[in-house]
């Protein structure tokens, strides 16, 4: 889809604002903007207009104002259009390669659509947090997921009313002292933790924690997945899941990936949340999990095993681990495009790859970035997020039997909405 905007009687900042809001609205509706036509633009202003709009990374064509006189105006308009917007340039913008990139707005729109197409039930253990119930209200209004909110129904609804929320009553509310739920929950927890010698008294004490309580709602089948972490640490969210939901058969580590939504594409960064110093075997498993996450969200994975060395340019024990992980990954998934070890710039940029990794088809086109350890991964995703303005969705916890996802304690309402939708899709 192309955007056409008139610049008559508009200052440059007004034109920029109009274009920004228009692109945002079009992409939120699932449309990909391929180029911008600026009409009524005097030739002497064409350069400054194109310079102003260059930041959107789209082709811009400026068309001068054409006064209407008679029927001949149509022919004049067509001739003017062809002169200022050559047909080959417009057709080039329609090429498949130019329509492939996924923008953050389009990705979020698609995320909600996928979640709604096969509604699942997600439990929210932090019902007392304003951001959680605001996100819940948004999703319930649009009927995207079914929600179980843990906490006192009357207190949560009263707070929702104070915040102007109108759809919270569509959720199911689960009190933590409800014996009809608590009794079978205690029995199941004792069964699952029998090897640890858990008693009924210990189980009840454990279930006084909302994270444990919410996790057991998933175990018992009341919910398909869980989202927590807006007021609790990652450990408080992950520990119950590891103990009672456990990992998928054959999966060793649980890892945390972020979906990084850039201006023109989406990438996966891992592990940014869980594994402190993974060995080669664990790194290869994290890469496999991350490639599967990419596929689940419509991304054709091309994996880069990151290091300070590109294809042998540097040496050291850390490089050895990454190179061994790359070897294992190729053995486990011979059809998966992968390059490693590789530096971030050579993985990211085709221009850098042409010098540092000449002849490698994956270098410069990586969209699944596997960091060598948690320090690099956590710093890396936050640095890229803050410096580029990329939208970071996650972490997505990979490798669990059922989806449990952790929120940053600094998560915004939109982040929570995205994570709940993402969790629902994983449950499908």
Tell me the role of every PLM-derived stretch.
Residues 5-10, 38-43, 63-68, 125-128, ...:
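Structural motif
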Residues 1-58, 289:
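Conserved catalytic-core segment of NTP-binding enzymes
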Residues 67-121:
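Flexible inter-domain linker/hinge segments
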Residues 49-51, 68-82, 182-192, 352-357:
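Short, surface-exposed amphipathic charged segments that create phosphate/polyanion-binding patches used
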Residues 2-5, 30-38, 60-61, 121-122, ...:
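Hydrophobic beta-strand segments of well-ordered beta-sheets in folded domains
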Residues 98-363, 368-428:
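Anion-binding alpha/beta catalytic cores of soluble intermediary-metabolism enzymes, centered on
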Residues 1-17, 92-99, 120, 274-278:
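Acidic/glycine-enriched edge-of-secondary-structure segments
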Residues 52-70:
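Canonical P-loop GTPase G-domain recognition
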């Amino acid at each position: 889809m192309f955007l056409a905007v008139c610049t008559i009687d508009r200052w440059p900042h007004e034109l920029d604002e109009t274009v920004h809001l228009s692109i945002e609205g079009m992409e939120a509706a699932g449309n990909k903007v391929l180029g911008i036509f600026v009409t009524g633009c005097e030739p002497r202003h064409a350069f400054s207009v194109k310079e102003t709009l260059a930041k959107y990374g789209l082709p811009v064509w400026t068309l001068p104002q054409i006064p209407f006189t008679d029927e001949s105006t149509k022919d004049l308009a067509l001739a003017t259009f062809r002169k200022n917007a050559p047909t080959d340039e417009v057709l080039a913008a329609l090429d498949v390669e130019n329509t492939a990139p996924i923008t953050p707005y389009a990705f979020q729109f698609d995320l909600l659509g996928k979640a709604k197409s096969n509604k699942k039930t997600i439990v929210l253990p932090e019902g007392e947090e304003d951001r959680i119930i605001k996100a819940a209200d948004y999703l319930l209004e649009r009927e995207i997921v079914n929600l179980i909110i843990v906490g006192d129904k009357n207190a949560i609804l009263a707070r929702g009313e104070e915040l102007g929320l109108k759809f919270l009553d569509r959720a199911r509310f689960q009190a933590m002292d409800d014996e009809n739920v608590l009794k079978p929950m205690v029995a199941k927890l004792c069964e699952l933790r029998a090897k640890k010698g858990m008693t009924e008294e210990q189980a009840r004490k454990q279930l006084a924690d909302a994270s444990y309580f919410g996790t057991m709602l998933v175990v018992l089948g009341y919910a398909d997945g869980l989202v927590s972490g807006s007021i609790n640490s990652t450990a408080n969210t992950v520990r119950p899941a590891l103990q009672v939901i456990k990992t998928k058969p054959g999966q060793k580590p649980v890892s945390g990936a972020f979906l990084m939504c850039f201006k023109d594409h989406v990438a996966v960064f891992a592990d940014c949340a869980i594994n402190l110093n993974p060995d080669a075997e664990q790194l290869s498993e994290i890469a496999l999990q991350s490639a599967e996450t990419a596929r689940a969200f419509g991304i054709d994975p091309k994996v880069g095993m990151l290091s300070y060395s590109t294809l042998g340019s540097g040496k050291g024990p850390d490089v050895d681990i990454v190179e061994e992980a790359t070897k294992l990954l190729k053995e486990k998934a011979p059809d998966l495009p992968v390059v490693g070890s590789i530096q971030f710039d050579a993985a990211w940029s085709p221009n850098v790859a042409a010098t540092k990794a000449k002849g490698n088809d994956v270098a410069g086109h990586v969209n699944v970035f596997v960091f060598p350890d948690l320090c690099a991964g956590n710093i890396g995703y936050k640095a890229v997020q803050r410096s580029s303005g990329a939208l970071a969705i996650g972490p997505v916890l990979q490798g669990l039997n059922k989806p449990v996802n952790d929120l940053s304690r600094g998560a915004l309402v939109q982040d929570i909405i995205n994570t709940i939708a993402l969790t629902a899709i994983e449950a499908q």
